Amino acid sequence: STLVTGVVPAAIASVGGLFVDAVANSLLQNGNDFSDFRQEVLIYVLVELGLVLLLTASQRLNMLCQSILRALLGNKINVMILEKALTLELGHFEDSEYYDKLVRARREASSRPLSLIVKTFDLFRDVITLVTIGIFLFQFSAWASILLLIAGVPAFAAENKFSGEAFRNQRRRSAERRLQVYLEMVLTREDGVKEVKLFQLGKHFLKRYIDIFNRIYREDKSLVLRRTAWGYIFGLLASLSFYFAYGWVGFSAILGVITIGQMTMYIAQFRIGQNAVTSSLTAINGMYEDNLYLSNLDEYMNHEVPELSGTKAYGPIRGDGVRFEDVSFIYPGSAKPALDKISIHIKPGESLAIVGENGSGKTTLIKLLTRLYKPTSGRIFLEGLDLEEWDIDVLRKKVGVIFQDFNRYQLVVGENIGIGDIKDSDDLERVQEAAQKGMADSFIKDLPDAYSTQLGSWFKNGRELSGGQWQKIALSRAFMRKSADILVLDEPTAAIDAKAEAEIFAHFRELTKNRISIIISHRFSTVRMADHIIVFEKGRVVEEGSHPELIEKQGIYENLFELQAQGYK
C-alpha cells in the first residue's frame, strides 16, 4: 500500500493533464464530429476515478495497519520495560539518576517506536513519489527537478536544530517533571490528602506545581517562537520556488513549448513534488527526533544489571541456620556504613528480636538477608552456603518478610492474602487459615463480600480499611508462607493494640517452632518473648543476649525497657 500511495498521485496528475488536452482538442473541432473526443474524455475520467479509489483504499489500509500496530507495539515496548524492571535491584529504584532513566523511557515508550516506523514508511512513500515526479519534470526541465529538491532543505536544517534543542530540554527537566507528577499525586491521592488538608498544604504544593510549569513554559515558549519564526521564513522560500516554477510552466505554455494539458500536469506534479519534499524532510527530521527519544529507552534497556549467578537449591549444612560474618554495608553516596562488621548466628527454631533506634540498621540487615542488597564487605551464609550461591527464587521462597512499609494492594481480600504464597493464592482454605493466624478473619467476615471484597479506594465498590486492619492483612500474607524456613516481621504491628499484638505473636511463635523467626519491634512486651535479642546502635551490635541477661547488664536495652515501662506506670 505504501508503494501505491507513492506512485498514484503522480499518475493522477498525468491523467488530469491528458484529460485537459482531450477537452481542449474537442473544443477546437468547431462543430465537427467530436464523438471520439467524448469517448477519450470519458476514459480519462474513469481512469482517474479508478486511481483515486485505489489511492483512498491504500490510505485506509495504511491507517488500519497503523492502528493495529499502535496497540501491539505499544504493549510490546511496555512489557519490555516492565520485564527489565523485574531484573533490577532495589538500589536501582532508590537511585534518583537511574529512576529518571526509567521515567524517561516509560514516558515515550508507547508513541515513539510506532512514530519511527510510520515515518520510515512515509519517507519510503515520499521517495517513490519524488522519483516518479522527477521523471515527469525532467522531461520539462532538469532544473525544475533540482529546484524541487533544494526548496525544502533550509526548513529541514532549521527544524533539525530545534528538534535537538527540544530533546535536550526534555532530558534536562526529567527531575522537575517527576516532581510535578509527585505533587499531583500528593494533591489527589487518598493517602496524601488528609495531611494536605490538616496542615493546609494545598496552596503551597499547588504554587510549587505552577512555578515548575511556568519555568518549563518560559523555555518552551522561547523555543516555539523561534521555531515558528524560522519555519515561516523558510516556508516563504519554498512558496517562492513553487510560484517561480508556476510562472515558468505558464510562460512555456504561452510560447507553445508545452500544451495546456501538460501545463496543468506539470503544475500539479510540481505541487505534489514540493509536498513530497517537505514531507520527506519532515519524516527524516522526525526519525532523527524519535531516535533521540528512543535513546532513552535504549539507555534504560541496555543498562547492565549484575547477573544473579547462584544456582544452588540447598546448602551443605541443613541445620546451620543463618550466619552473618563480619558484614558491612554502605549506601551509595553515603560516607558512613549503615551496618558495620556485623557477626550473628541464628539457628533453626530460634527466635531473634532486634531493637534499636530508627536508622540504626535493623531493616538494612533484613534487606541483606533477602538479597535486596549485597554486602559491601563480609559474607552471609544460609545452611552453610553463601547467599550469592543460592538460586535467587529458591532463596526468596525460603524467606517470608513483612516490612513496616508493606504494600496495600488494591485487590480483593483473598488475593491480598493469597499472594503471600503465589502457587496457592487461589486456595481459599489456605487463605482463611492464614487470615485466622493474622487475626484478620474477624473483620473480614463483616465485609460485604467477605474474602471477595475489593479493598482500597481505587476501584468501584472498594472498601478502605483502618491502619490496624491493613496490618493484619499484611500479617496474614506472611502466614501464607508455610514452606518458609525464615519468617521476618519488621515493625508490622505498629497500628495494632498491645493485646492484639500479643495474640498475633503467640500465633507467630507457634507457626515458627522449627523455623528461624526474626522480629523487629519497639514494643518490649513482644521483644522479651524472643530467645535471643540484639541491640543495634549506629549500624553496630552493641548488646546481645536474652531478656533477663540484657536487663542484668543494665546497658542500653535495660534503659530503653525502663523508659517504656514507665509509660505504663
Question: What function would you assign to each model-found segment?
Answer:
Residues 70-114, 176-219, 291-302, 452-453:
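Extended non-transmembrane interhelical loops and adjacent amphipathic helices
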Residues 172, 201, 225, 245, ...:
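Cytosolic ends of transmembrane helices, especially the final helix of ABC transmembrane type-1 domains
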Residues 1-58, 134-166, 240-247, 251-260, ...:
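Transmembrane helix-loop-helix hairpins at lipid-water interfaces of multipass membrane proteins
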Residues 87-90, 303-306, 440-444:
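Hydrophobic patch in the ABC ATPase nucleotide-binding domain
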Residues 1-9, 28-44, 62-66, 83, ...:
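Membrane-integrated ABC transporters
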Residues 13-20, 78-82, 95, 99, ...:
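Alpha-helical transmembrane segments of polytopic integral membrane proteins
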Residues 9-16, 52-94, 98, 162-167, ...:
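Juxtamembrane helix-loop junctions of ABC transporter transmembrane domains
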Residues 309-310, 315-569:
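ABC-type nucleotide-binding domain
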